[in-house]
Structures are given as structure tokens and as C-alpha cells.
Amino acid sequence: MIKEGKFTAHYECENCKKPIPHSKKRWMVERCEDRPTAVAQVPGLIGFHVWAAYSYSPAADWSILVREYKEALEALRKGDPEPMQTFRNTVLGEGWEDSQAGKVSADNLAKRRQSAELGNGYSILGEDFTLTGVPNGVLLITAGVDTQGGGGTANERLVATVWGWGVGEEGWHLGHWDIDGDPQDKNTLAQLDRIAETKWVREDGTVLRLARGGIDEGGDATSCQAVREFCSTRKDVWVPVRGAPQKGKPLLGRGVPVSINRKNKPIVKNGVNLYFVGYDESVKSLQYRLGVETVGSGYLHFGLCSTDQFLAELFPWRRMPRRSRGQISYHWEAPTGARDEGGDCTRYAYAALQLVTRRYTPGTMWAQLARSLGTQAPGTGGGGGGANRFGTGGRFG
């Protein structure tokens, strides 16, 4: 119940159904009887499950527990399972089964892949970098790039993925590539120009180009410098990004002006802006998006480029508990040895989409984009007929 803006709660007697106020809790607990309801699996050893409602702690006031449950339930409906997981673990004393885990598994996502048996009919190595068959629902294209290694380390490369976006942030995976070479080498980074120069042709003939792309600037000074220098001459498309591991950080922070050489002096006037991508928020957002199973707003389509390996990398993270000063919190962690390049690239591509949205009036962006293309914004029905054959990928460099 809610009274005068505050939660009140009572216990309902299982026999007479009459309400018992919280003020009677101590009286109830002192007169309770513990009765076994199951046969002991180990002879002579019994146990009882007692949850927080029996506690005398002020924090276990029934009204507080009701409020916490309602808040956790509301968060769960919005795609955030952490409050409910905490409530189930610490208040009810029960285990937590993440209902989203099955939805985001590689096997389940592979079932959504459209016409994979048709093969990869396109190559980004074509002379004019033209790719056809992009669904009509796509109004905007962004990219995310992850840096792997550098400075002569093993398996050094760039990993890039491209997503198309439409009304309601419905998304289509359009391309995924491994670009061999040292990410600290400007010649390796220059391979990204191929993606920026690509003409993405929709089924209705409308031509799109990459609107924005986020490049992970890596973890060392040399990689940061290389990425920032690359972006400084391509600021209309590429921006450097970096993960923000602290909880509570927004999915995409405000741009922070940074130097792009070791002398702390910008090579070009105003330098470049670095954007921090909130790790917790972006992973949580991706989990929610992958859990959307109805085509339309928020749904993510997978095409020919969405290989089994990419889908395995798309969401390897699991929510793991950590205890600090007696409090339990949950953090996203990938199992040891698990690859997450596909997920990182997708998080950066989605952050690039959020960067683009800052240019537009809220609620009118998709209509404005459609008008700029000379078309009408389609409904959220999957992007038009024949949109089942799309996407490209591979390795180059």
C-alpha cells in the first residue's frame, strides 16, 4: 500500500487472511514455531530458510522491503536486472537465474540470422567500395573499432563492425572485418578509410555513407597518439573513444578535448574530442537490445556478416557479485579467455549513434534523416521486403 506518498506494508495471515501490521513483527517472531516441511537429505541435519522480513533491523521494515521490491521490479521492466538480483540474493535469500542469459547466447542469436546459407556475396575490396542490398529501413550507419595489441605484439589488428540504424533504433548488422597490422601504424589505421568511403546502397537505390565511427584508442600512450592523430584529420567521421569502467558513468560522456602528441600540444587547432563510453551502461544496454525479440524498435537484425564467431563475441559478459565493506554489488565480467571484440565494436558503434543523436531535436531525428535522404521514414516493420540478404565481412590489410 501507499499512504501519503510513503509505502506501508502488512503481513496477511495465511489462515484468516487478516492483515498484521509491522509493529507486531517482534511479537510474531518471538512466538513462532519452526516446523520442517521436507525430509532431511542428511540424517540428523536440518536447516531453515529465513528471509529478511523476520529481521529486527530497521532496514528490514516491511514497508522498506516492499519499496525495494517495487523499485527492483520497475528496473527489471526497463531492462536492468541488477536491483532484482540484489533483492533476490540479499532480501529473499534465493538464487538468481538471469532470464536474459539464454536470449543473448550465440546459439539463440544465430537463429535470428537471416539467410546465412546464401553466402557472403560482397567484398569491401571492390574498386568503388559499393555494397548493395542494405535494407530500406536503414537511415544511418555507424561503426565501432576495437584495437588489439600493437607495437609488434602477437595477433595485433584492428577489428571493425558496422551497424545500420532506423526508426526506434532498430539495427542491422552490415559488416565486420579483421584488419591485420599494428594499430599503432598509421598505414593500418588508414585501412579504415575504406569503410568510410564505402557506398552502402539500399534496396530502393538510396546511397548511404558512414555517419560516425568510434575507435578505441587503446591502453598505452603510443596507441592513443596514433588513434588521435588519425581522427584529427577525419573529425567529421571518426572520434577516439575509451571505456569508462566506473559504475554510474553514462553510456556516452561529453567530449573531452585532448592533445594528440607527446608534447601535450595539439597538432591541429582545437585537437580532437575523446569520448568515454560507460562500460556498465553500454553492456547493460546491449544485453537489453539483444533481448528484444519482436522486430521493430530496439530489435537487432543479423545478416551474412554475423558469423558464429562474431555472435560468440557479441555478449560473453556475465553479471558477477562482489562484496565490499559488507555490501554486495554486481559487475559485468567476461570469462577468462573469452573474446569480446564483437561486443566491444558494437558498443562503440552504438555510442557513435548516440553521438549523432545529439545533433537532432529529440523525437524528430528519424523523420529529419529520412527527409535528408529524400525518402519517407519507414515504419518499424523490419525494413522492407527482401531485407534478408545483407551484410559483408572478412579480413583485409
Identify the role of each PLM range:
Residues V145-T147, A211-G219, V241-R242:
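Short His-Asn-centered micro-motif
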Residues M1-K6, Y330-E333:
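Short, intrinsically disordered, charge-biased short linear motifs at domain edges
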Residues M1, P19-H22:
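Cys/His-rich microdomains that often coordinate metals
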Residues K6-A9, E341:
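Short metal-coordination and nucleic-acid-contact micro-motifs, chiefly zinc-binding Cys/His arrays
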Residues L92-L140, T147-R212, R389-G397:
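Nucleic-acid-processing active sites and adjacent nucleic-acid-binding tracks
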Residues R26-W27, V91, G218-G386, T392:
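C-terminal nuclease/phosphodiesterase catalytic domains that cleave nucleic-acid phosphodiester bonds
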Residues C13-C16:
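Short cysteine-rich clusters marking metal-coordination/redox-active sites
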Residues H22-G144:
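A contiguous, basic/glycine-rich beta-loop/short-helix subdomain that forms a polymer-engagement track
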